[in-house]
């Protein structure tokens, strides 16, 4: 769970606490975050909790401790996120990310149609290239069909027997969870 404990005068979250699993059978504070802004643009996040959460946890990892952990271009697009190891983000004419470069040299390159629909994503990690193509409602990975998208969810085509997954939506139509046919999340 999350609890906002303070906002700034612009309505931005200034302090946030997250609670989650801290051990095999224990729960507690996993994040005690303080946000710093320049106007409405976040520039820094600090976490007063130094212990990492339980395996598989979702706590914030403070990957940098500088005054400008996040930087932006003239259009307000994020160009650097040191906490996630992102050293540079380039944008196309539609202000959509075209190339994301990480501090370890990995890259993600995006290709879009003229109206901004994503056609391809290319990940280069440790010299290994993975190409994902988005063709209508089918997602291909390195030329092999991996997912068939539907309004209700998707079909995982990466195994010998296709597996169906369904979206659970809230009252506003937002996806809140994805479950399989056995209702496992």
Question: What is each stretch, according to the model?
Answer:
Residues 1-15, 69-131, 155-185:
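Residue-level markers of secondary-structure register and packing in elongated scaffolds
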Residues 1-59, 115-117, 122-124, 130-138:
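Conserved catalytic cores of ATP-dependent inositol ring kinases
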Residues 36-39, 64-66, 128, 148-149:
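A short, polar/charged loop/turn motif at coil->beta-strand junctions and beta-hairpin connectors
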Residues 49-66, 150-159:
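Surface-exposed acidic, glycine/proline-enriched linker/cap segments
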Residues 134, 143, 148-149:
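Extended, non-globular alpha-helical segments
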Residues 137-141, 153-156:
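Short polybasic amphipathic segments
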């Amino acid at each position: 769970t999350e609890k906002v404990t303070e906002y700034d005068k612009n309505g931005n979250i200034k302090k946030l606490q997250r609670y989650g699993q801290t051990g095999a059978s224990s729960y507690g504070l996993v994040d005690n975050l303080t946000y710093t802004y320049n106007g409405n643009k976040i520039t820094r996040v600090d976490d007063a909790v130094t212990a990492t959460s339980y395996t598989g946890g979702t706590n914030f990892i403070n990957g940098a401790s500088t005054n400008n952990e996040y930087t932006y271009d003239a259009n307000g697009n994020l160009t650097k996120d040191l906490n996630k190891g992102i050293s540079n983000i380039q944008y196309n004419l539609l202000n959509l990310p075209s190339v994301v470069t990480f501090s370890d040299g990995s890259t993600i390159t995006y290709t879009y149609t003229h109206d901004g629909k994503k056609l391809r994503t290319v990940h280069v990690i440790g010299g290994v290239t993975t190409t994902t193509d988005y063709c209508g409602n089918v997602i291909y990975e390195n030329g092999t069909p991996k997912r068939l998208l539907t309004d209700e969810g998707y079909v995982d085509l990466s195994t010998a027997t296709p597996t169906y997954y369904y979206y659970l939506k809230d009252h506003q139509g937002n996806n809140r969870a994805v479950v399989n046919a056995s209702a496992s999340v």
